[in-house]
Structure formats: structure tokens, C-alpha cells
Amino acid sequence: MASDAVKYMPIHGGGTTATTAADIKSFFSALKPKKTSTFAYAFVITFVSFTLFFAFSPSPNSSSPWFSNIFTSSSTTTTSDNTSGSQFSSIFSYILPNVTSTKPTNRSSDATDSLSVNATSPPLNSNSKNGTLQTPAPETHTPVAKNTTFESPIVNGTNPDAKNNTSSHPLLSDKSSTTGSNNQSRTTADTETVNRNQTTSPAPSKAPVSVDLKTNSSSNSSTASSTPKKQTKTVDLVSSVKQEIEKWSESLKNCEFFDGEWIKDDSYPLYKPGSCNLIDEQFNCITNGRPDKDFQKLKWKPKKCSLPRLNGAILLEMLRGRRLVFVGDSLNRNMWESLVCILKGSVKDETKVYEARGRHHFRGEAEYSFVFQDYNCTVEFFVSPFLVQEWEIVDKKGTKKETLRLDLVGKSSEQYKGADVIVFNTGHWWTHEKTSKGEDYYQEGSNVYHELAVLEAFRKALTTWGRWVEKNVNPAKSLVFFRGYSASHFSGGQWNSGGACDSETEPIKNDTYLTPYPSKMKVLEKVLRGMKTPVTYLNITRLTDYRKDGHPSVYRKQSLSEKEKKSPLLYQDCSHWCLPGVPDSWNEILYAELIVKLNQLSQTQRKT
């Protein structure tokens, strides 16, 4: 339009009124034929110009209220979505402070993480580096399947039976945020609350609140001065967790934890013999008079990596506000006591580590719990040697008879189904005479099998356990582990027939002398592969088979009965393990698994 005006202006400007009037008349005459199109053209240019001006110059003031509101609303909506859609823990708020918490994208095919950010994570790739269990070959000796630490796949990335699947995960959701910075100085009332709730599953927590160290100050002036110290301590602990993960994650992610050897390390054991008064007498070999001590200085060394030394302070920080539960037989009690001693030795004030109430029975099944007060966490053990219920019926003669209900899980299962980390095991009690024979002992419903092979009974029991896990344990909130069979080393008999191991002071060094891989563990592996809920298999069978030197043998107690004094060598324990000892290494593997999973989650967050 400007060019048209210039085009029809008089040369040299003109000067008379008549000329000007004529020019104006001429100008409008020229526009008249194109009046409609010219007006539309001018309107479009004007609208676009104003639109661009407001779009690229947003302002909160009244000069651009419409676009200002659009930008502000968009930002607010994004923040809200992220907050409601991501429930990450304080640990990861600290570890990844600059990562925006959003719903994760699908992981790469080689990820092996049961700590996926939500329940719709992709299924585990069968060829993943550290998460696949290959079918054990029919070998004479214990096979070491590549990457035997595996998680069973989740069909289509989801578990249809899991309840309340959310993006919250164990070790991820901020359970400690409800107590804020006061976790380090819990009141007596808080402690009593912990004690009262040890045998009840924790109520579903609300959406976690991220802990912001910059604003985590008390409004009370009397406590404000102590806040910087608490914050500094928390930052130091979380920084240590981050450093531990960064230090070990790369070497551990492709490592086959269970293929390796025992090597001597003079820096072991992880706690001084006799320093932990929590150890049962039957595991306290040095106190019971065992003279040799080299068995305590051995650590498990995988071929392709080194396991991190278990740092109790860091593990406690990972477990802050959480429950770690062991469920199974006395071998899992062995592992539980080992971990409690390691963690207890890492706290500054051991008076703040205590047993919740001693041995507690729930419907006939024993439960033990230790409270770590400064961390508001518990490490518990539930006695369930078969993982299914021991039963009692009355026969036609009115005589009470013991049976094993293959179709019912242990009675205490309701008490631990909501725990954050659960470590199951079973195996040794299936070798006893009654279970081995299987005559009039195994029961399903009202039917008592006159005869049932022990392997079939074992399969039925584990299938019942697996179905219970899929129905009751939410993989979005709980990590599930299953520890494999722990080898026994009776020579010249069994546990009740004069079997011995008291002369063993060194581990087996030649694989030829290892025992065949237990058939029951092959059954277990098949059940785990068929499960939808991720279960990490701690296949410690082979690594324990080397350790014929690690059992209590005759050093299982100090005061012998008169009968035992006459033939002390006839009463030996070659099933359980001295503490400190082999179970410490099981816990180091568990610790390494947690580091791997936390690192995988952090990588997933970074990608989003």
C-alpha cells in the first residue's frame, strides 16, 4: 500500500490546491477497482504484526494480558503434571538434583532393572547383560548360568495382578519426607509408634514430597540453628550414596556375580568377631571356641568385577524409612543376623539399634525385628521354612497329624507383603525325612496325598508362593529377591546321623569336588521364569558349595548335654554358617544388586 501511494504522488511535490485535489481524486480512483483485496491484505498484515509482537514479548503486565496468561498457565500445568506423575525418593532428589522428575520413557533393551520407574516399563530382554537366567544345563556340577541374577519378565511391561501400581518404587518414594529433617532426632513417641507397627503392613503412603534442602528449614527459631548441621549431615550421607553408585555401577552392570572364586582379604571380616551380641549361639563359632580364623578373611570375588565392600551407613541411608524383610528358614535367619550386625556396627550410637520386642509369634509363626531408630527403618525376619503352611488334621482315630498345606502360604504373609525389600528362601526343610518320603504328609484342600514325590510337592508349594506374590506384592512398591539353596557339607552321614565337617579349615579349590546342582533349584528357576512379577534370583548355591570350611561343626554351642559330651563329634552343624562368615558375602551381593538397580533408575531419569 505504501508503494502505491509513492507511485501516484506528483513529481516535485506540486503546489496548488487544485492540483492536490486532483491528485487525491486520482489516488482514490486508482484504488477503487481493488478496494476489497487491498483492504483484506492490509488487515492480515496488521493482525500478523501485532500477533508476533505480543508472542515474542510476553509480559506479566496489562499490556499483554492474554499471552501472558497463556505462558503462565502452561508453565503451571507442566509443573503440576510432573509433580503428580513422579514420586521419587529423597535419595534420588539428592542424587539427581537437576533432573526434572517426569514419567520415564522406555528403557533400552539391555536394561535389567526391577526398579523401573513405573509399572508399565518394558519387559526384560532375554539377552540382557545382568538380568537373564539361562536354563541350567544338565551338568554334573553346579552350573553357573550366565547372568543368573535375573528378573522374571513382566508381560507387556505390566502386571495385571499387581495392586495399586504407581510410579512410586522401593528406595525411590520419599518415605522419610513425612518426618522431614527430624528423622535424626526422633522422639520417644515416634519410637513407640515404630514398635507398635512392626507386625503390621505399612499403610499406603501418600504421594511423596521431594525434600528440598534449600528450603528445609524449621519455622521454629529454637530449632533453626540446628538445621544447617542436620542438612549438612544429610547432604554428606546422600553424597556418599551417589558416590558409591557412580563408583561401582559401571563395573557391576555387566558382571556375573555368581561366577568367581573365594580370595583372602585381611581387611575382612566386616565386623569384629564377638562384637555383635545379636548373633545366636549356634552361629557364634569363635565365642564357642573355634581356634582357626582364616575362614573369616575370605571374600567372594566374581571373575569379571569386584564386589563393593558393604558400607552399612550407605545401606542404611538407602533404607531410610523402609522395611527390609527376610522370609524363610534358619539359613535366612543366618543372613538376617549377618546384615543386622553389619548395619549395627556402622551406626554411631548402638543404643538406638534395638529389638522391637524380642521374639514375637503371629498365629504360631515367629517374627523378629530390629529397629534402627535414627533411620526409622527395620530389618526383620519371619520364620516360614516351607513358605507354605504347616498344618494339623485329626484322623479317623482322633489322632492329630501334621501335614503341609501346599495350597496356602505362610500365616504371617499379611504382615510383610507391603515391605519395601523382601528376601525369600526355602530348601533345607524339604530334605528332612518326612518331606522326602512324602507319605500322608502333603495336603491340598481337604485332600491328603497318600504319596507325593518331594519335587512335585516343592513345585506345587513354590507355585502357590508365586501366585501369592503376583496377587499381593506390588512390584511398583516392593523389591522381591529369592536366595538360592545354601550347600551343606556333611561327611560320613547327615545332620542326624553323625555327619561331620569339623576338620575342614579351607574351601574347596577343585570344581570336581562340588556337588551336583540341586534339582529343587531347577524347579525354583522354572517357577520364577513363569512369574509376571519381577523376582531377582540370588543364586548363591555354587559359591557356598566351595565353603566346606565355614560351618559351625562342633563349635555350635558352649554347654553340651551329658549325651553330647560322650560323643561330641556326632553332633555337628554342617548346614548353617559361622558369623562373621559366608552370609556376609550374600549380603554384599544383595548390596551390589541394589547399587545396580539404583544406577539403572538414575539413567532412566536422565534420559527423560
From Swiss-Prot:
GO terms for molecular function: O-acetyltransferase activity. InterPro entries: TBL, TBL_C, TBL_N. Residues 101-137, 145-203 have a biased composition (Polar residues). GO terms for cellular component: endosome; Golgi apparatus; membrane; trans-Golgi network. Keywords: Membrane, Signal-anchor, Transmembrane, Transmembrane helix. Residues 101-236 are annotated as: Disordered. It is found in: Membrane. A motif (DCXHWCLPGXXDXWN motif) lies at residues 573-587. The keyword Membrane applies. One of its GO terms (biological process) is cellulose biosynthetic process. The keyword Membrane applies. Residues 215-227 have a biased composition (Low complexity). Expressed in leaf vasculature, growing part of the root, expanding inflorescence stems and trichomes. Its main location: membrane. Pfam families: PC-Esterase, PMR5N. Belongs to the PC-esterase family. TBL subfamily. PANTHER family: PROTEIN TRICHOME BIREFRINGENCE, PROTEIN TRICHOME BIREFRINGENCE-LIKE 9-RELATED. Contains 2 motifs that are conserved in esterases, but it is unlikely that this protein belongs to the catalytically active pectin esterases. Tbr mutants are lacking leaf and stem trichome birefringence characteristic of plant cells that contain highly ordered cellulose in their secondary walls. This is Protein trichome birefringence. It comes from Arabidopsis thaliana.
